A protein has these predicted regions:
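Small-molecule pocket liners
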Residues: 97-101
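Ligand-binding pocket segment of bilobal, Venus flytrap-like solute-binding proteins
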Residues: 20-91
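Solvent-exposed, polar/charged alpha-helical surfaces in well-ordered, non-transmembrane soluble domains
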Residues: 16, 20, 38, 56, ...
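Short secondary-structure boundary segments
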Residues: 4, 71, 136
Length: 189
């Protein structure tokens, strides 16, 4: 099961992770990556609008043989429903998925909340903030916390959107814009 890359940011990460994995295989290239991603999507019975919807469709409705999702969603499903129900399979290579968080100047200036907003942003990456993230199955980036949770989060070779795809703007235009590779792959289904 897979969310729709046209409507879900998380699905874009998933799609690009599969593409990146294919590129990094021996003799990997864009054509082989396109073939792999097309093969994956030929097996998707339903494209939900987002990751949580895909998880619900897969876990609760039993639709599909495989769920491609955020790491935390997979761990949560296994912990809630039992290790005998699902196996989490990690690829040898994936994307460093870091959804953006930012202080929006126009908003904080209008509301006078810059210090609070910046404190929150700083807290997210503090040791304490990363402890909270890790307890909720998000892979921590703080070195101390990452070490404490190393058994929960297997080591992965991670690539970035910038290095592999030339940044989000280029990836969006190439893969997810109307007529892009996702449309070429999925509309042929």
């Amino acid at each position: 099961h897979h969310p729709n890359p046209k409507t879900s940011g998380g699905a874009r990460w998933n799609y690009l992770a599969a593409w990146a994995w294919a590129l990094k295989q021996p003799a990997g290239n864009d054509q082989k990556a396109k073939e792999l991603v097309a093969a994956i999507f030929r097996n998707v019975p339903v494209l939900d609008s987002g990751a949580r919807g895909s998880t619900t469709t897969f876990v609760e409705r039993g639709l599909g043989d495989v769920l491609v999702t955020w790491e935390n969603e997979g761990i949560l499903a296994v912990n809630e429903l039992g290790k005998d129900k699902f196996d989490i399979v990690y690829p040898s290579l994936s994307i460093l998925a870091e959804p953006p968080v930012a202080v929006v100047d126009k908003v904080v200036e209008k509301r006078g909340t810059r210090l609070t907003a910046q404190a929150y942003l700083d807290y997210l990456y503090s040791e304490e903030g990363q402890q909270i993230a890790a307890k909720h199955y998000y892979r921590p980036t703080h070195p101390t916390v990452a070490g404490q949770y190393a058994r929960q989060f297997p080591k992965l070779k991670l690539v970035t959107i910038d290095d592999t795809f030339g940044g989000w703007q280029k990836a969006q235009k190439t893969h997810f814009a109307d007529g892009g590779t996702f449309d070429q792959i999925y509309l042929k289904k």
